[in-house]
Amino acid sequence: MTAKILGSLALFMVASVAQAKGLIMTPPVSSFLITQKFVCQASNNHPTKTAQITVQVVDFNGEVIQEKSVDLAPLASTWTTPLDGGVLNPDLPARCIIKSTNVGSKRLAGTAAIWVDFHVQLAVPAVAVPQ
């Protein structure tokens, strides 16, 4: 029983770290917990179709703090937006929600699904150096 619990906990921790690093993609909606400023980058790997992407920063009451939409051009175009999630409240961090309105979650045989890769990178805060 203890081994089963530890195994489940380890799997949860690995999945959480992978999602935080942007390694797990779950279109059409990906959600990342943020506690400081961050940058979001998306790459559209479809050769002819445009991906429609909306990035929102919301608090846990569902209120939208910031929102930006973009049509991401074909052929691995990239888009980076400096959305300022900030630290609204150390005990109540915000959440970044990335929505893609026309992105397929998997490639199907005979279809040309749009595939978008998301990466969320936390900005490193400046550190004051004593004089």
Task: List each model region and its residues.
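Gly/Pro-rich, tryptophan- and cysteine-flecked surface segments typical
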Residues: 19-131
